[in-house]
């Protein structure tokens, strides 16, 4: 039985709660989402990865979010070549690659990752990452050294397309921009036995408003405010529900290596997990994203420079270990 349990945890099948694959659209679901949009809880998607039918964006009423005088329609917030900038006074001037991209082949970086680089669970938070690290990841996406263990997941495939379409100036200017300002606290980590029921829409978990369910050995990360998230408000973050006891378990693994199961993360990721040179920070970042990266590295689908070091650090980890590590790192202050 122990062997069976270990084999299950070491399975090559990616955990579906972390690799959020959009289900096939249905007319009934589209109609329900359109009604929700009209009610002001826009849970639809945009013209990028995981796009929804255009009908859901047809509401012409101006929308706004707290702390801004900007008003935009839902359709405007879903323009992959002109992402909404609700708080233009809170970031430096954007380079073209972040603000607009290049039609038709290169989406604006600020569309998926938000103009302030805070990102979403289905992609990376770019704010505060080392410029050299961002540049290397784009090279890895372009060369095929960085892929996803779940080939059906939209955002990694979009990154491969965008990396191939981007030129050196696009990449270096975006990297310099996102690395020039800090990442802010974005994820509230909560240990829980039960969580709101969710479904996958637009490559992320969204609540169904239909009661609760056991969390089990998963991380469920969802918007704090669905409407603001779908309007791409870079001031509205996420809540991540993690198993009870996972933060303490993760702390032990992160700080000690768990008696040889892994290595102390601070060795490479720096004191307080805030990064070290070109090595990225982990503190406060999306736990869903962190699990995906550990799993991808363990499976060998992410294999750029320095990946061999990380492969050695994750090759003995079970998915439960990854959950614990990600719960702990996400709970730390950025």
For each predicted feature, which ranges?
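Intrinsically disordered, low-complexity segments enriched in Gly and acidic/Ser/Thr residues
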Residues: 257, 264, 272-278, 286-291, ...
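Sec/Tat signal peptide C-region and signal peptidase I cleavage site
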Residues: 4-9
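Short cysteine/histidine-rich zinc-coordinating motifs and their immediately flanking basic loops
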Residues: 120-126, 277-283
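Cys/His-rich metal-chelating microdomains
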Residues: 115, 271
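Short, cysteine/histidine-rich loop/knuckle motifs that typically chelate Zn2+
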Residues: 111, 267
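Short microdomains enriched in Cys/His and/or Lys/Arg
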Residues: 130-142, 286-298
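Flexible coil segments in periplasmic/lumen-exposed cytochrome c-class electron-transfer proteins
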Residues: 10-107, 146-264, 299-334
